[in-house]
Amino acid sequence: RRGKPLEERSIGNTNLMDEHRKKKLLKNYRPGKLPTDLSRPYFELSKGQDAVTQMETCDLNLWMVGDILLKADKMSMANSLELRVPFLDRKVFELASHIPTKCKVNANQTKIAMRGAAEKTIPAKTADKKKLGFPVPVRAWLRDEQYAGVVRKAFNTPAAEQFFRTKELNAMLDQHISGKRDNWRQIWC
């Protein structure tokens, strides 16, 4: 990704499939807007800022609102849980938005200011722990024939055949199972 504009590099972190792969998998693929078409206005909004700030602006306006917060809200409601997002409290957000990038992240560490503050009240080992979110072992499940069999069955239904080139879907699953390619994210989506 080196040498590409920031907008393309940033999208590359989350883009699951390039246009070529979409054409291979989908029978009637019609390209719509590219991810960079959606993110460009937010990079323009923060033009002149450092790369981290530009990516944060894009994430705040696209990914958080349209993806991660939406999913968290739906999943918590579906399970009768009340979810709190303390870092989105207005006062906390306003304070955090004034923290210089050099106090947020460097080549070796993320969340520098937050970890520094946390180390004053919790063990350093905990404050320095890697962020995990809620990892689900989908990669491993898709290499287990019991679960891969369920996916393969879905890949070979009349509904799947209507929209997808199922031979390509099955090849993608086979590559993942054999370890030739790590396709779990593309299969899962």
PLM regions: where:
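Adenosyl-5′-phosphate
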Residues: R1-C189
